């Protein structure tokens, strides 16, 4: 009975048992996703991919816009700067005021200056850093503003010391003496500062902006806004003059005009107009001294020769210097001028400024003084090479300027006798009666046959190329010669003494360059530039003291 029951239970279990192969199939077979789900997932992936592409496109668009904005701002800044320079006030009566440059500071290698000179137009025209470097190896830069006052000098020094670590700062004595605040000149200099807190402080304090409205501040602070109404007064020179072309001279402006000391009105020039340092000047001079002490820089105050300086000014500045333990060099004193071999008759541009002759003498004295009192470190070869290149450019510019202005025939010949130059000579009327022996020697140094000197009112047509005479014709008749040194350069020289036609002509490439006046007409042609660089007349019919 029990066996029958057990058998029934097993039969029942077998009916409920699932075959093994079916269990395995059910376990192994995965459920395939529906078509809707596949389409949905594919659609989601496409959306994400499209969103990524759109995001990248937007980023690229934003980047392009950013580049365009940056380019626009850069172009605007450059245009604004150039227009500001074009519109800036130009001094028609005193050209030197138009060529102050401050921003050459940012092109100098950092900490490459041994000495920094800061001052007025007197330093601008009276100190030539490249001559000091050539003679003494001292690197220096001159940073100047017309009628520079102590507050302007303070901010210039502050800006310079961000980029240079000089051993000495030489400050113009006219700065502490004080005077009227030249806002036009100060603005022009400050606008060359790099954008910084110093620049805005300088604008505010040097341009007297306290109490001004925002519009007034903008109009006073920037050349463009200050002179935006002056379009109708612009001349070609406003667009063509480029002060940056002289930046290699390190803040120096070479001038060749000469005012003899005997022509000056000394009693008027030397009359004092100030008798004590004003409160604002004392304040900023104190700041200058404190800044120099903080940076470990020695401060020297120096006055260059000037007929507009007097014992009152010297006493004012000297007392401040003594109280603040600052060295004061007054080169207006006769004892210093004797040491310098300073010639009052040849060294002045006007009553208050030196010409190139005086500048070289004063610079030599300063260089010697600095060498005797300071030990300067040697410079890297890179800096030495750079200064050598700048000096050579300065020397060429110097010779060119003197060649155009000198009244000394011997000096002119010395400068014109250059391998790169062609010298053309033509006599009209007579050029021999007043010739000095030294002038004859100079002409002979060119290789000329001097037989013409013994002939009164003789004709002379000659061409010297690179120091060699290529053609010379002289006699009592009208004479002419031609010379073609190379293709597209044709020279014709004609000379007729007083009795032979009384004429001078020097034609180069079809253009007349002779002054056609009595005496020795000379034209100098620069082969490297393919242009005439000087056309002069020396009336050597007159004696030297009569010219």
Q: Each PLM stretch: what is its role?
A:
Residues 1-44:
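N-terminal targeting leaders characterized by basic, low-complexity, disordered sequences
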Residues 147-151, 276-279, 305-313, 432:
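Acidic-and-aromatic substrate-binding clefts and catalytic sites of carbohydrate-active enzymes
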Residues 186-295, 378-398:
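Secreted/periplasmic serine-hydrolase-like ester/acetyl group-modifying domain
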């Amino acid at each position: 009975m029990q066996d029958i029951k057990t058998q029934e239970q097993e039969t029942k279990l077998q009916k409920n048992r699932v075959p093994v192969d079916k269990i395995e199939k059910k376990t192994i077979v995965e459920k395939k996703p529906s078509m809707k789900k596949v389409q949905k997932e594919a659609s989601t992936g496409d959306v994400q991919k499209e969103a990524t592409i759109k995001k990248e496109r937007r980023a690229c668009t934003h980047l392009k816009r950013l580049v365009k904005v940056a380019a626009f701002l850069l172009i605007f800044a450059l245009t604004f700067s150039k227009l500001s320079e074009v519109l800036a006030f130009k001094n028609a009566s005193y050209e030197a005021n138009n060529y102050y440059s401050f921003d050459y500071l940012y092109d100098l290698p950092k900490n490459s200056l041994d000495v920094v000179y800061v001052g007025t137009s007197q330093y601008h025209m009276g100190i030539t850093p490249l001559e000091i470097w050539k003679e003494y190896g001292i690197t220096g830069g001159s940073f100047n503003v017309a009628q520079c006052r102590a507050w302007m000098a303070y901010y210039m020094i502050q800006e310079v010391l961000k980029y240079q670590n000089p051993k000495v700062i030489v400050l113009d004595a006219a700065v502490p003496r004080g005077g009227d605040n030249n806002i036009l000149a100060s603005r022009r200099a400050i606008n060359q500062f790099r954008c910084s807190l110093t620049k805005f402080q300088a604008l505010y304090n040097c341009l007297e902006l306290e109490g001004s409205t925002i519009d007034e501040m903008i109009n006073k602070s920037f050349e463009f806004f200050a002179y935006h109404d002056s379009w109708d007064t612009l001349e070609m020179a406003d667009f063509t003059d480029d002060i940056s072309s002289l930046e290699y001279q390190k803040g120096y402006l070479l001038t060749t005009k000469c005012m003899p000391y005997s022509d000056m009105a000394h009693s008027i020039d030397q009359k004092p107009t100030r008798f004590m340092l004003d409160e604002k000047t004392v304040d900023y001079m104190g700041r200058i001294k404190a800044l120099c002490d903080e940076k470990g820089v020695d401060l020297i105050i120096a006055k260059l020769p000037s007929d507009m300086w007097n014992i009152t000014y010297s006493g004012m500045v000297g007392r401040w210097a003594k109280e603040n333990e600052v060295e004061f060099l007054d080169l207006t004193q006769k004892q210093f001028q004797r040491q310098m071999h300073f010639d009052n008759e040849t060294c002045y541009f006007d009553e208050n400024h030196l010409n190139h002759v005086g500048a070289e003498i004063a610079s030599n004295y300063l260089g010697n003084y600095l060498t005797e009192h300071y030990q300067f470190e040697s410079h890297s070869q890179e800096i030495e090479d750079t200064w050598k290149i700048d000096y050579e450019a300065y020397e060429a510019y110097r010779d060119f300027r003197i060649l155009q202005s000198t009244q000394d025939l011997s000096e002119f010949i010395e400068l014109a006798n250059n391998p790169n130059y062609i010298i053309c000579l033509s006599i009209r009327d007579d050029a021999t009666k007043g010739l000095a022996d030294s002038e004859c020697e100079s002409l002979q140094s060119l290789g000329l046959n001097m037989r013409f000197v013994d002939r009164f009112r003789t004709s002379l047509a000659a061409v010297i190329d690179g120091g060699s005479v290529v053609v010379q014709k002289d006699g009592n008749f009208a004479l002419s010669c031609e010379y073609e040194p190379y293709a597209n350069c044709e020279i014709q020289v004609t000379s007729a003494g007083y009795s032979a036609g009384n004429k001078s002509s020097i034609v180069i490439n079809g253009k007349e360059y002779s002054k056609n006046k009595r005496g020795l007409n000379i034209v100098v042609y620069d082969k490297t530039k393919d242009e005439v660089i000087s056309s002069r007349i020396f009336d050597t019919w007159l004696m030297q003291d009569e010219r």
